[in-house]
Amino acid sequence: MSSVSSAEPTAQQNFNPSCHFRMRPNAANRGGSISSGNNRSSGFGGGGFDDGGDEISSSAIAAAAAAVLSSPVVSEFSYTRERLLELAPTGSIMPDALRDQLFFNEKNLPLVSNTPLSEHEQKLQHNINSSKAMSLLSHADRASIAAGAAYGSGYGAASGALQNGQSPTSRWAPKSSWNKGTPDRGTGTTPRGGGSVGRASGAFFAGRGGGRIGGENGFGGATNGGSPAAQNEDSPGTYQSKFNALRRGGGAGSVGRGGSTTGSAFNTRADALYNPNDPTDRPKAVNPAATRSESDEEEEEGWSKVGSTSRTSTNAAPQSSERPAWARSESWIQRTQQQQQQQQQQSTQQQAQPPITLWNNREVGSDSTVWKDRNHMVAAVRKASTENHPPQQQQQQQQRSSAPVSAPSRQESESTDVPNLPIPTYPSDPSAWSNNSMGGGIFYQPTPQPPAPIVKEEPVQFYYMDPTETRRGPFPKDQMNVWFKAGYFTDESLRVQRGENGEYKTIGDLKKLHGSSTPFEYLEDIEPPRPILPSIPYPSATNPLYPAAFGGVNMWSSMGQPTDVYMMQTNFEQQLVAERNRLLDDHNRRLAEEAEKMAKFQEAMYRQLTMQHEQRVREQELLLQKRAEEIEKREAESKREEAARLQKLEQEAREIEERKAALEAEDRRKREIEEYNRMCEKKKNEIIAKEAADRMRLEEATERERRRLEAESRVAEEKIRRDRVRAELEAREREEERKRAAERERIARETASLQQQAELDAAWAGKKIATVTTSNSAFTGAPKQVSPSGSEESDEWISTSKEVKHTKTAPWAAKVEAPQKSEKTLLEIQKEEERKFKVEQEKNAKLKAKEQASNITSAAAIAGDKSGGLWGASKTWAAPESNSSKSYVSPFLDGPSLEAANKMALQKKNSQPKIAVPAKSAPTSAKVATPVKAKATAVAVSSPATNQKTKKTKEQVATDELQQWFVKRFQQFSTQVDSSTLFDCIMSLENPNEVEDIVMSYLDESKTVKEFVREFIKRRIAMRAAGGRPDADDLTSARTAAAAPSDSNSGSNSNSGNGQGKKKKKTQKQVLDGNILGFRGTAAADRLNKGEIDAVPSAPVNPSRR
């Protein structure tokens, strides 16, 4: 895609939405070129008509048909042509995705606009049908729009005259004319925007702004105030108005750039909202002046009549107060159409041939008809052209044949657009200059040369050299592109050749030269054809002005008759003929040489191709031979592989059978082992059950004995408690008796004192002493007052004395007066307590003897013998309250007490027991405690023998338990080894490492075996510690403290100091029990431990000491 050189910065801003529809390029567009012989002038605003101006370009007709009938296509992503040109740099290759776009066109399209819009145009373009946009306009602007000034004040506005006599206010400033006065070129009379003709305008040209009514892009027209172009025999006339009616945005009423929406039946923005696939779904043109019924009659199949005249009267002046602005502008369009019809009638009188009046099946002045589709329109145009102008095609061919050599390229490009559409033309009249009275037969007329034959290029063929140096091909370019996109040419070193004799290039080079997406899109360097001189015939007369250069343009009708221009050149023509012949001979000679060289080259190429073909045949034969050998080798290899595979399968089958037999043998062996293990386990379970039953019976007997002892202990405790309670009651009774005796003594003293006082009072008063009872005043209350007069005759005194004498005695008075029992003395109390303590001690001795007997018979008892000396020791005298409930200690629940443990340690240390003689508590209790001392001494003497027998029994039981545990655990690992013999072997070993090595040699070195050995060593240490056996070389635990040396050892050691050569005898070590210390090593929470700080609280200050 190449860029457009005439683009301006404002082109993108003034983008017209109508360019979104697919349009075909044409020469009559803006910026197109106008051919005028050798003088080619580029029209800026209005494109000219090629081929002498008599023929309208076929691309223009096609573009007109496409613009009218093509449906608008709405895309999700729309890109303007200007935007695509900005994004794509010059010389770049377009992407493949761009070709698939709906609006893509490979040919260059002209720009829509190069001039910025005015303020009114921008307002109307943004919202052209909005009442809001109209409300923003002023009254003058609305009047201008009603007259067509908003869209008609552009390129076609004349500087002198406007519609309805309006003044040019707020319009575009016209640029200066590009016209240059030359004697051989017609000039326009007005600059851009007015006049009959524009730049390079003449009777033939339709210049910029003049002569073209409603141009293709809407630029200019006489309806905007400019005078019409001069009508002559070559002007388009009525045909141009009919042709303009086909353009979208054009038509007879088109004004300004892009056409007016008032004169057009379609609005591009509104048309895009309808379904493009439904021909009936089209916008409808509403005539504001017509009624609803009239507008419905004008519609046919959903299409509005384009360019049709209104049914309302056009003679009436528009009323601005009655009709809207767009309706008022319609009257101006109608008046413009009437002016065009008048101009067309004048032009028909001057034309040399009748105009085309029915080329699109319409009549001048009648209402326009509507085609159903594009095919309908093309058929109508073709029929009209064939019926009305059959001889014009031959004249058109003659004119095209007389064109210069440079013309066919443009003709071909234009004829490819609509090849089957015949276009009516206006042939030129050569009789105006060939049949001149003065120059008839003497003018030089060059012989028309036939156009250069169009040689169709052969399709491009590609070859490539594969990695085996074999040339592959030929392949078409499309196939190579497909393979490249599919990813077959990934190797950039692959060599590719274009054509038979092209140069080999790698894929990487082609990517760098032509792009990574299309490396095969490039042109081959072809030698340009040699120029051929035209044949010049001998002239019959002198030739004026050498019009050969203008022969192809048919401009003779527009040029005047040359006068008095004669030039006789007879000798000169002969020289030209001679020179021409010489040049022709040289050319023929060169052609012959070239033909000979070409023949030789072809022969050499044929030989080379033959050799290459033979070489390829030989290479193919060698390749086939190699392939056959490879196939034979592969077959032999496959046979060997098959044999090896079969042999391997047989070997695998044998191995599977062997493994199966081994697995079966292993299963049988495992079942036998399991059966043996099950039998052993059964026997072991029976032994364990028997042992458990025995143990259960022993435990039950022990439990019964323990319960019996506990019951007896509870009975003894209850008896002791009752004795204590009775003693307390007796003491309380004695205290109460003492208190009562003291009270009686007090009452007696008070009674005696009262009697003495009464006697004293009677003696002093000389009266009879009143009789007073001996009852206690504290219990009887205060005595009655004796009459102070003391007369016996008083009745009150007599009755009172009688009542006192005969008062009944209180119940407790008899008890007080009863004789009291004598109290026990302190000696009697002590004797009674000693008697009770003796009885209690005898009971405890009997209980202890029974307990020792039960400990000897019980195998589960451990520390029962240690409490034997507890009851043998004599106790000092104490009160009955000292016999607490803890006097009995159960060896099964509480274990040996601290005193029993200390006594046992003392008995082990001394060879013979010593009899403890307790101190006498009191002289009176010495004789009473003697029998108790004797019994305690007897128990202490007999205790060592009993403990020794018990100890031996415990060691044997612990060893048996350890052996049973070892055998049970060892058989879990292996049942083939005699575990009892192994136990006896390792029990004599002191080193734990040796024990571990022996056990692991029979089993394995797994983690479970090591744990088993460690547990065995720990249990052995615990058993030896419990049995009192010292472990001299046991390094797994801390060393034990050495026992204190005995008297015999100390004596021997002192005596051994005399003999220097004698070896010192090692002292026997002894394991000490922690209970001997009488305390535990753990920290107590209720006392201060090491490392703690004792904070002494400060004493409060006594305020009295200040």
Curated annotation (Swiss-Prot):
Entry's Gene Ontology cellular component terms: cytosol
Gene3D superfamilies named among the record's database cross-references: 3.30.1490.40
Coiled coil: 584-746
UniProt xrefs under CDD domains: ATP-synt_Fo_b, GYF
Composition-biased stretches (Gly residues): 207-224, 248-261
InterPro entries per UniProt: GRB10-interact_GYF, GYF, GYF-like_dom_sf
Biased composition (Low complexity): 30-42, 334-353, 390-410, 1046-1057
Keyword Protein transport carried by entry: no
Record key words, sorted: Coiled coil
Pfam families: GYF
Compositionally biased residues, Polar residues: 1-17, 162-180, 229-243, 306-322, 786-801
Region feature Disordered, mapped onto this chain: 1-50, 160-370, 383-434, 778-811, 909-928, 1026-1076, 1087-1106
Name of the protein in question: GYF domain-containing protein gyf-1
Gene: gyf-1
